[in-house]
Amino acid sequence: MAHYHNDYKKNDEVEFVRTGYGKDMVKVLHIQRDGKYHSIKEVATSVQLTLSSKKDYVYGDNSDIIPTDTIKNTVHVLAKFKGIKSIETFAMNICEHFLSSFNHVIRAQVYVEEVPWKRFEKNGVKHVHAFIHNPTGTHFCEVEQMRSGPPVIHSGIKDLKVLKTTQSGFEGFIKDQFTTLPEVKDRCFATKVYCKWRYHQGRDVDFEATWDTVRDIVLEKFAGPYDKGEYSPSVQKTLYDIQVHSLSRVPEMEDMEISLPNIHYFNIDMSKMGLINKEEVLLPLDNPYGRITGTAKRKLASKL
């Protein structure tokens, strides 16, 4: 029989805003074998549950708690029986399981991050079972579902590091007594893209294809045409262009959040060595760095 501390008393002057508990970074490699042709999904999954009762917090009564070890095991078993077609579908399966299996679970939130494996390919021929780690952006998702509602689905890209050596500048900004930054018409532009978007509720979505489309848009608007590039007057303008094109080309998308750090590369002064360095040798600086953020959504249609 479970024992808890009866001498604990509820404080009527304090109330919870939100509670949750779960298991983080549950790692799984799922292999789908179709004859000799194998497909893989490696993921790290974090699950948070909110219960209808707060007695575990207030009184130390654990009788409603689903152990976090059970949550870990559930992720493993669902991967076996449901597979992982997409990380978004897998996250929805986990939410649905806990909400349907336990009446006292009122909220499930699942974060899944996919390891970027890519199938070996040469001269258009794909290998049947060999993969290479290819970190050109990490695919992640967040799914939250309340007992009384549909799942709210976000997908995203992170750790997509890009750089261009020209077609970027920064001019016309405010200058005061503390400004030392010179205006520049031509500079390196490097960033590590983080973007997250929310889907319309209740729509059937090809999550994998949509993610590929958004990543292509990010690369396209950052780099521009392959033969000449595209000028960026600011990180803000590039961020906005990505959002506008994504919302235009992906009808399933409701809104989009982007964060772009401005990773600096500065020309190294070689004048003391009698050398002129014309932006050929640059010094990468990890910090400090600027960071530009923005969230854009579709405007509601006018009823007039």
Curated annotation (Swiss-Prot):
GO terms for biological process: purine nucleobase catabolic process; urate catabolic process. This is Uricase. Its main location: other. The modification Phosphoserine is found at S39, S63, S232. The modification Phosphotyrosine is found at Y289. Pathway: Purine metabolism; urate degradation; (S)-allantoin from urate: step 1/3. The modification N6-acetyllysine is found at K10, K23, K27, K36, K118, K122, K164, K175, K185, K221, K228, K278. Its EC number is 1.7.3.3. Keywords: Acetylation, Oxidoreductase, Peroxisome, Phosphoprotein, Purine metabolism. It comes from the Eukaryota. The active site is at K23 (charge relay system), T68 (charge relay system), H264 (charge relay system). Urate binds at T68, D69, F170, R187, V235, Q236, N262. Belongs to the uricase family. The modification N-acetylalanine is found at A2. The modification N6-succinyllysine is found at K10, K23, K221, K228. It catalyses: urate + O2 + H2O = 5-hydroxyisourate + H2O2. It is found in: Peroxisome. Transmembrane segments: none annotated. One of its GO terms (cellular component) is peroxisome. InterPro entries: Uricase, Uricase_CS. GO terms for molecular function: urate oxidase activity. Catalyzes the oxidation of uric acid to 5-hydroxyisourate, which is further processed to form (S)-allantoin. A motif (Microbody targeting signal) lies at residues 302-304.
